[in-house]
Every structure is written in structure tokens, then in C-alpha cells.
Amino acid sequence: MRFSLATLVFASALALGACGGGGGSGSGGAVSSASPAAAATPDFTVPRTFAAVLQNVGENGPADAARIDALASAPYDALLIDEIGTSSSAYASTQAAIVSRLHASAGSSLAHKLVFGYVDIGEAESFRAYWQVGWTPGTPSFVLSGTDPNGFAGDYPVNFASPTWQAIVFGSPASLIDRAIADGFDGVYLDWVTGYTFAPVIAANPNAQATMASFVAAIATYAKAKKPGFTIVAQNARELSTDSRYLEAVDAVLQEDLFFSNSATQAGDIAQNSAVTSQLLTELSALRFAGKPVFSIDYATTSANATSAYTRARSAGVIEYVSDRALGALSSFAPP
């Protein structure tokens, strides 16, 4: 079934109004006189907890053994790790064994952990195997001038409308999606889906937002045909939910900065604007109603902020993880 985000916001509010415990008559009687729409069912086993660790999970070989042991023993249902099989690391070929090891370990509520691979589709990363000597912004043409908003050196915005870039992402054994499938991941986390908001990207392609929706849909169609049940988790990009192609393509969303953000100079604890949080929660509720589980990563370095984020996320039905900006190790703030 095709939905628009506006329809979903209304439908989820209608269902909540019919089921909710507010007093007063007013609109309550009118809502209850109609049969509320039923929430859709997610297309995959939804974890109760997850952790994201994007550094030092195999790319350094034996030096990362303790980190991998810690991930295997940690009581999380799902793990989001970098797909080192697509990196230039000398240990790239160990990725499948690492995924297998993590799969074999138990989660907090699942007998075996789910493992998702990190794939950046909106930026070119200079440490990936596809990056060639001599590449620089403008050469090749799809690598655009600009810096990563989070301050990570060597990451560049891309014109993702480029067939060459899209071929790097999926469609051949060496592509990012194909490697993730071959290495045994349960799915992928698509980062920088919001690449359509970058000024250099808009200058190169004024229809960047629609192009990204088509791009994600093409990735999902390809991946699910190659590995049925492969899960597509998309980063942020709530605006794309008004596009039915995108909404049908993604299985879940991961929203960053729901309660606390970070910057290039601050690892976390930047309180999100309350109006922004309220709007995010409304839109994310609609996505959950459409059968799209919502994950969230908030960036905090204090116990008080971590506890606040976990408590508020749980009350909103959001699967939360709190860590610092680097995501370089398991957080010391485990979910309660």
C-alpha cells in the first residue's frame, strides 16, 4: 500500500486518538465513531536494542580482537558496524568471518545478533577501496568540492545522480552493496541519504531530493532481489517519506540528534531544540505507524543526558543508542 507522510501523520494521530486515554468529549467521540486504521507490520525481526561502533572493528586486524570480543559478548540485539570489506584495509577479507562471529552471539532478546553494515551513499570516502590515486574534488566529476559537515577529513559530497557513482554503490561484485551481501550482513545502514541537502550537490543537480529517493529505491530493489529479506535502514531524510518509492524501499529509519547533537568540535551534549524534537517525534510516529521501526542515535557524554535520551526515546517507541560523536567504541551508557 502506498502512503504519504501527511496521510500517515493523520492516520497515526487518529489511531492514537481512538485508543488514547484523554478525558473530555469534544473530538474524542468523533474519532471513536470511525474505525481507526491499523498500524502496518515491520518487514523484519525488530531488535529491542542496538549499538553502533564504526571504528576499530576489524580494519586493524589482530589489534581489534578485543573490540570484536566485546561486541560479541555485549547484550545488544543488533550491531551497526563499518563494512571493512569495502575499505582499503589489509584486513578487508576478514569481514565475513567477523560478521559470522557476531551472528553467532546472543542479543538482549534475540538468540542471535543482527548485524548491519555501514554504507555511505552520499559521500565519497578516501579510505575505501574504490578511491583511486589522483582523485580530488572535480576529478572524477562526481566528487564535488566541499567538506564533511561533521568535520571528517577525506569525505567529500558526491553527485549521486552519476551512473559511475551509482555503479560504485551497487550492481557488481566489488560494489558496496554487493560486498555487504557477500560478507553476510543482514542489511545495511545507508548514511548521508541527506546528501541532497548539500549546496554543492544541489548546484550539480537541482532535483537532488527526487534523485535520492529514486537512488534508494533502486538500491533496495536490487539488494532484495539478490538477497531476499535484506534490510535497508536509512539515515535521517524524513523529507523523503513523502515519496512513495522511498517509503516502500526502506525497512526502517535511523534518526540522529533526536534529543542531543554534536558538532565538529563537541562530542555531544548539544540539546536539540524542543520544537525540532516535537516535530521529529510526530513524523517518526507516522513512520512507525507505517511499519517502519525507528532507531535513534543521540550524542551525549554525561550520564544525565544519556538517561534522559533513553527514557524519552523509550516512551516514544524509538530504539535508542547513546554514544559520543566518534562511535569508536561501545558506549559506556548501555540502555536501561
Residue ranges of model-derived segments:
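Bacterial N-terminal signal peptides that target proteins for export
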Residues: 1-8
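C-terminal motif of bacterial Sec signal peptides marking the signal peptidase cleavage site
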Residues: 15-18
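Bacterial signal peptide processing site
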Residues: 20-24
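Glycan-processing catalytic domains of CAZymes
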Residues: 31-336
